[in-house]
Amino acid sequence: LGGRTLEVLHTPGHSPGHMCFWEAERGYIFSGDLVYRGTLFACYPSTNPEEYLSSLERTACLPMERLLPAHHALDIGPELLGRVRDAFRGLKEQGKLRHGGGTFDYGEWAVRL
């Protein structure tokens, strides 16, 4: 793409076919609907909270310099992805990572299950 190489990452959870795009050379991740400031939605029949967590696990370990989401603030710190992953882990440990689990507010972002 314009002399740049982007790796397509299948990151289901928000939707079955959700994808992120990883530009390893620059450390950019285009996260789409996986992570952004605002309310993340994992409450619809097409969402899967467990797969969402798996996608967060796989992407949070990338050596990111920039996190570029599809909504709201377009350039947010890459550490947000790790914070979202950690919160999803905590919800799983509490037995709340499931449809109907509730809405959980973490300040700059929230998740509705």
Please provide the spans of the model-predicted regions:
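Catalytic core of the metallo-beta-lactamase
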Residues: 1-61
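Accessory terminal helices/loops
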Residues: 57-66, 70-113
